[in-house]
């Protein structure tokens, strides 16, 4: 591996892994279940790196041996052919392992393991945009089912002809943010709306925001910045009209963010839920600002033009979903039915490649 800093990093990871293995075997650790669990989790997060590094070291030894055989087999054409083939295979294997190791050593996004709030807002397109927001809600709910995640509706504003003007889901499970963070942005649909009598294709949009859940320590909100009113749940467009004012309408004065919560059973629960959504929204704004800085830095380095917020177009006539970041088409119906794993894995892979290129540039400069 040409990059000496990577070898140093791998040796350091291996030392940490061995130390954690030693601590797990210590009877004192076993007597403290919390400590044991914490160490086991840390060790588990390094296991793939260490195993891949071991495989790489063995392949390096085998390559030295195969090259030696190749060098010494001048008088035996058959043996020379076998040795040349083995050298070739080992070089390919080592190349793959080195790329894999670089990916495994990329810094992890600290939010990757978090649960999320997923917000869908109808954009341009009137009633059809609200119906489209409802279709996206169904798509994400189905994808969450395939992942074994739990989905709960936490806030909704219904569209007049169906769907939603705005809807927020809470999604809980393993590494939710690590996958769904790539869904944030504008989703555009091109189709003949159910509301269209003339059979003309319309273009509508909905915006998806992915907000990692945050606790009160991470985002502090000054109570003076909050304006809160209560109302009866239900009413226009809703069921379960209550005589008690359980619904909460919360306004964050500095940002103008407004949240209306009706889904919980009591006013207190709705207030807590509204504050939870507000924290997630404020954190997402902060994250977006940080990401925009990184992205603009990346653009200035690689010289690409500004990217549109529009991440995907769903074209019903041609039965395809085009992901504009990947420049790739996918079959429309499976995607709408929640079969998003291929798309998301492609986005993860592209993100890793961009970060690897960035790493190579910065280490070359250093």
UniProtKB/Swiss-Prot annotation:
InterPro entries: PCRF, Pep_chain_release_fac_I, Pep_chain_release_fac_I_sf, Prokaryotic/Mito_RF, RF-1. Disulfide bonds: none annotated. The keyword Nucleotidyltransferase does not apply. Methylated by PrmC. Methylation increases the termination efficiency of RF1. GO terms for molecular function: translation release factor activity, codon specific. Signal peptide: none annotated. GO terms for cellular component: cytoplasm. SUPFAM superfamilies: Release factor. HAMAP family: Rel_fac_1. Belongs to the prokaryotic/mitochondrial release factor family. Peptide chain release factor 1 directs the termination of translation in response to the peptide chain termination codons UAG and UAA. This is Peptide chain release factor 1. It comes from Trichormus variabilis (strain ATCC 29413 / PCC 7937). The gene is prfA.
